[in-house]
A protein has these predicted regions:
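N-terminal subdomain of nucleotide-sugar transferases
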Residues: 1-56, 60-64, 96-98, 170-172, ...
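Conserved donor-binding/catalytic core segment of Leloir-type glycosyltransferases
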Residues: 6-7, 227-243, 248-252
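Nucleotide-sugar-dependent
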Residues: 17, 243, 293-302, 309-331, ...
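A short helix/loop element that forms part of the nucleotide-sugar donor recognition site in Leloir-type
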Residues: 51-58, 208-226, 382
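Membrane-proximal helix-turn-helix segments that form the acceptor-binding/catalytic region
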Residues: 89-93, 112, 116-120, 133-135, ...
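A charged, aromatic-enriched C-terminal amphipathic alpha-helix characteristic of glycosyltransferases
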Residues: 361-366, 376-411
Length: 420
């Protein structure tokens, strides 16, 4: 029997919520298939201090060896260069002690090292894009291209993006929309088979309507002062940058006029005043807005309280490659959605499954039409919606797709296998 050894590089921390939802579950699944994974991640000091032991416990009895590195935030640019230096050093330490068959690079900073290993040592690497990262930085107003430094950095990473795509052994895209965009670039050697689409999946054992305890649900409802006859709609996630709280609040106002017993349940770790101020601007009574910061274990229950959930994401070029995890989580709970078009594959997913309503513009007329269409879908067929989520975004399906990529690459390196 043989064990394949890989390095998985994430510039996101495992003590961050994203690492815990979008990295660790996949790696735990892959590690059960006789794969030893050396996981390198960059951890923010406070979160690492609070969550270190929790993450270490997750890896007990697995084939995952965690190599946490310190994330440096300041000064800009220089801090990132310092992180890359530490990353290269750690990778070299691992290579000295292990016969590595593959490097899996999550996003662009990681791929800088993966690309070098492919070029210098011939080690295969997966470019797991996660999105058009450089364009996201511009569209999200993080990089102002009027600043010459950011213009240089942007151009550098756009050139690297094409290099990673050509150089990698496999590309993982979150959406078919982004895959088609890449194919339209007509890069040398890039065809349909080189790009695997794996959307952001959800743990549908956790986000499951079957896992809801009715007594706990009633208790939570009472604690939030939500009445039995309240018409609850929810939003789950951040309130800044990409997520359009003002427009979501405008739609809720339209709903509250039509259904006076409406309440807007906002599940977020952000400051509640962001939501309350958005409501105040529209003269929506504060009593209609419920803002709740929740542990991951509570989120399925909060979604389950709602008739439907909404999310509006700022449309932009980079959002062709976006796969909102919240969509899979909400549908996993059997709850329909109202959302907007021009974000990854969201429109096709929602419309093909008849699991909600998609709007094309942000205005009162569109909101009224969307609400009428949603009300026509209610009461929702919760079981059908949950089953549809399993079809397109189950964690098990995502793990199997990654496993197929790994085994295809491993099979080309049969001479590099290390005996157990």
């Amino acid at each position: 029997m043989y064990k394949f050894k890989t390095i998985y590089i994430s510039y996101d921390g495992m003590t961050d919520p994203l690492g815990q939802s979008q990295v660790i579950p996949y790696l735990l699944g892959l590690s059960k298939h006789n794969i030893e994974i050396h996981l390198i991640s960059f951890e923010k000091a406070e979160k690492y201090s609070n969550k270190k032991h929790h993450i270490e416990n997750l890896f007990i009895d697995s084939n995952i060896i965690w190599h946490p590195l310190k994330y440096h935030q300041k000064p800009p640019v220089i801090s990132t260069l310092l992180d890359i230096w530490h990353l290269r050093k750690k990778v070299n330490e691992i290579l000295i002690k292990n016969n590595i068959s593959l490097v899996h690079c999550r996003s662009y900073i990681s791929a800088l090292v993966g690309g070098s290993l492919k070029k210098d040592k011939g080690i295969p690497f997966i470019f797991d894009m996660r999105g058009f990262w450089a364009d996201e930085r511009v569209d999200g107003n993080i990089w102002n291209l009027k600043n010459p430094l950011f213009k240089i950095i942007y151009n550098f990473f756009k050139a690297k993006e094409k290099q990673f795509i050509i150089q990698s052994d496999k590309i993982v895209s979150l959406t078919n929309n982004a895959k088609n965009e890449i194919l339209n670039w007509q890069l040398n050697g890039i065809n349909n088979s080189k790009i695997q689409v794996i959307p952001c999946c959800a743990d549908l054992n956790h986000f499951s309507l079957y896992a809801i305890n009715a007594v706990q649900l009633k208790s939570l409802q009472k604690m939030l002062a939500i009445a039995e006859d309240d018409f609850v709609v929810s939003y789950v996630g951040s309130l800044g940058t990409w997520y359009m709280i003002d427009e979501m609040m405008e739609m809720f106002k339209v709903l509250s006029v039509k259904i006076p017993k409406s309440k807007f349940l906002i599940v977020t770790a952000d400051e509640p005043d962001i939501a309350y101020n958005a409501a105040k601007k529209l003269n929506i009574p504060k009593a209609l807005i419920v803002v709740k910061k929740a542990e991951r274990s509570e989120v399925p229950y909060l979604i389950a309280l709602s008739k439907f959930s909404i999310f509006f994401i700022k449309p932009s070029y980079s959002k062709k490659a976006s796969s909102p995890t919240k969509l899979a989580e909400i549908l996993g709970m059997g709850v329909p959605v109202i959302c907007n078009s021009n974000v990854g594959d969201v429109q096709s997913i929602v419309e093909e499954g008849n699991v909600g309503v998609v709007i094309n513009e942000f205005n009162k007329a569109q909101y009224e039409i969307a609400i009428e269409r949603m009300i026509a879908l209610l009461p929702a067929d919760n079981i059908s919606i949950a089953n549809y989520a399993k079809k397109y975004a189950s964690l098990e399906d995502g793990i199997n797709k990654y496993l197929k990529i790994y085994t295809d690459i491993f099979n080309t390196k049969s001479d590099d296998r290390t005996p157990l």
